[in-house]
């Protein structure tokens, strides 16, 4: 059994260069739920900490103040309308998605999961996204 250490995974991380910018380092989008915000906030922090050049948490308008107050280094974007979601997932600068924490076991969550998976971009399914 191997012990977790940087030697096991360091080669999997992309190289960084002096001319790197936030988009060349990757743009992670976390879809956060409400009122359960903890897991999505932790996921966004983890993405930023592991080296994503830009991390955005996408939430409903009512949840915006909660996330904005808690996440200083993460952008917060409202996706209340269907076209907001569709525009965000179509953005070519976005590298990867995470959906599920606090999303709710809803038809809309299932629809969004299917739309995200159809993009072909790396997508992490967690919590409610695994249930729908």
Regions found by a protein language model. Give the residues of each.
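Small-residue (G/A/S/T)-rich helix-start motifs and N-terminal tracts that mark the onset
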Residues: 1-127, 131-132
């Amino acid at each position: 059994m191997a012990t977790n250490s940087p030697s096991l995974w360091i080669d999997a991380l992309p190289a960084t260069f002096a001319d790197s910018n936030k988009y060349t380092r990757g743009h992670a989008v976390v879809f956060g739920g409400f009122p359960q915000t903890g897991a999505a906030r932790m996921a966004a922090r983890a993405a930023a900490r592991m080296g994503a050049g830009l991390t955005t948490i996408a939430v409903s308008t009512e949840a915006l103040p909660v996330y904005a107050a808690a996440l200083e280094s993460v952008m917060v974007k409202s996706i209340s309308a269907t076209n907001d979601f569709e525009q965000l997932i179509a953005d070519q600068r976005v590298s990867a998605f995470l959906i599920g924490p606090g999303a709710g076991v809803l038809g809309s969550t299932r629809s969004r999961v299917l739309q995200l998976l159809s993009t072909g971009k790396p997508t992490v399914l967690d919590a409610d996204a695994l249930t729908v």
